[in-house]
Amino acid sequence: MSPSAIAEKKQVDNIQEIKDKNQEPAHHEYEHLTNVGVVKQKPIDHRLKDNIKTHYSPHLDGLQEYKRQYQESIENPEKFFSEKARSFMNWFRDFDRVFVPDVDNPTKPSFENNAWFLNGQLNTCYNCVDRHALKTPNKTAIIYEADEPGEGYSMSYKELLEKVCQVAQILKYSMNVKKGDTVAVYMPMIPEALITLLAISRIGAIHSVVFAGFSSNSLRDRINDAGSRVVITADESNRGGKIIETKRIVDDALRETPQVEHVLVYRRTNNPQVNFQAPRDLDWETERKKYKTYFPCEPVDSEHPLFLLYTSGSTGTPKGVQHSTAGYLLGALLTMRYTFDVHQEDVFFTAGDIGWITGHTYCVYGPLLYGCTTLVFEGTPAYPNFSRYWEIIDKHQVTQFYVAPTALRLLKRAGDSFIDGFSLKSLRCLGSVGEPIAAEVWEWYSDKIGKNEIPIVDTYWQTESGSHLVTPLAGGVTPMKPGSASLPFFGIETVILDPTTGEEINDSHAEGVLAIKRPWPSFARTIWKNHDRFLDTYLNPYKGYYFTGDGAARDKDGYIWILGRVDDVVNVSGHRLSTAEIEAAIIEDRMVAECAVVGFNDDLTGQAVAAFVVLKDKSTWASASEEELQDIKKHLILTVRKDIGPFAAPKLIVLVDDLPKTRSGKIMRRILRKILAGESDQLGDVSTLSNPGVVKHLIDSVKL
């Protein structure tokens, strides 16, 4: 069976396995985790900077105001979201309907025909750049911190507008990009990456950013799926003191992308040895100087696609999640305002890459929509030392800092001496993103970075949601519980479903599958060129609900606790990786007969990847030396690094004689997860396996 066929079979099995493993009677396995004290937010007046001190007030007047507005967003979404959209966004043509109503409940938006702000017209770039450049042209839009300390610079809204307009003309006239075309972007975290996205949206094209850590094979697949004729990249990247051959990776990918006509190359390092293939490749600066510094926006409909972002799916084939323009922008803007209590005088630092949704929403679009300053950081938290984040925060007087728990665990492990000497008093809000944050990391973050004075917003959301689903709200609004994402954002109606029956659990303490009962403006509209897959992945598993793929608990106060993925996706360092995609890469190796990939807990990255591998010729390892075994494992790890990227490489390879399977041939990955978690005594009844004797062999193999 081919890797793609194996992946498709996994999709069919996936939901059933979720239900199979929940056949036992309901119990409160995680209730003890939710028994934590409430941490109330404290006044932050003494942290206000001079440019905001005289007129600052929170956007919401406490928890009761949140509850009132939340109730309105659920009971009267038409009024709530129309007022917000008209108040905070500029429209070239006003919308005449807020959403397509549900057939059975006209006051509720429809999942099947999810569309918002119908017949309205606007432009993303105008809302992010033009309107601020007109009002406050000299205000700083972007602060750039290069990989090497001291090499950065700032850019005003006026300068940003001029550069965006020039790149928009490169796209339109030098590269023949038209409204509705997709443009692939493979760039490091530099201002030119933001300029690129804004220029693409300015002419009504659709950007498809590929994280610059993906391999050439992964990049190739995403370019081909999106049908991009144009790729924008850099010659090289700087990260952690190392040079990354960005353009070489693009060149390798383009060997199998016949439709690509042009590549625009920004010379980040100006290395003359980097391949430049004329006339296909165009030089950023040479082209930019050809064009004037103003070029008008292209009005687009509210539902016009803004971008595709490929995310890992349970079948292994990456999904091009498609976001629309108006709904996505409103979600980004409202969460900036209410989650982080952002004001236009603020400096917002998201330590996330634009290759992921966090960088899209909270480095590019959210801050610029709101008219504040966004900080773009090219480097890593450990270079040149573990003080880098804190140095940046003090240097630029950052007011909101947003980072993944993986980075916090790394910095906590490095020791508090790296924090000594830094004030960090400009901060008013700390954020966590990408994975659940453990209570002890939350407390360290609050104590050492926030001085126990400022809120931590532990945000839960996804590529598909576009913006926050469940989160505390800063500005003195939400009492916090360390480890909990807390309460749903406006318009988000969360429910806990019984995984077996699909029925809502309304107990005071509920555990099950987290689902959303109604669509919201920033919810993804489809999967690019595959709406059936969108329905099968998100809306069909539990009819009438959006299936998040996460398990969750809801405590007696209504707070949501995320318990992790219930599908075949592993969350490594806040990045969702498809186990099926990793399996497919390993199975393609000529030595391998079968493979099963699962996630397991890791102190640093949250989860790590483990691969259980059956070789075609078992004799090749049954009598092999330890050195030969290590060579086999290294070879398989390198296979994944090359096919997908370094971040997807398994931390553990276990060579085994066989895998645990049902009589129908389905691999029971649940058993592998239990063994890795040290829960071999909790496997349940394994007599239904076609090969029950393999369980002891697996346990012994992991011990080895």
UniProtKB/Swiss-Prot annotation:
Coiled coil: none annotated. InterPro entries: Ac_CoA_lig, ACAS_N, AMP-bd_C, AMP-bd_C_sf, AMP-binding_CS, AMP-dep_synth/lig_dom, ANL_N_sf. Pfam families: ACAS_N, AMP-binding, AMP-binding_C. It is an enzyme of class 6 (ligase). It is found in: Microsome; Endoplasmic reticulum. A motif (Microbody targeting signal) lies at residues 702-704. ATP binds at G434, E435, P436, D458, T459, Y460, W461, Q462, T463, D550, R565, R576. It catalyses: acetate + ATP + CoA = acetyl-CoA + AMP + diphosphate. It comes from the Eukaryota. Its EC number is 6.2.1.1. GO terms for biological process: acetate fermentation; acetyl-CoA biosynthetic process from acetate. GO terms for molecular function: acetate-CoA ligase activity; acid-ammonia (or amide) ligase activity; AMP binding; ATP binding. Keywords: ATP-binding, Endoplasmic reticulum, Ligase, Microsome, Nucleotide-binding. GO terms for cellular component: cytosol; endoplasmic reticulum. CoA binds at R239, G240, G241, K242, T358, S573, R641. Belongs to the ATP-dependent AMP-binding enzyme family. This is Acetyl-coenzyme A synthetase 1. It comes from Candida glabrata (strain ATCC 2001 / BCRC 20586 / JCM 3761 / NBRC 0622 / NRRL Y-65 / CBS 138).
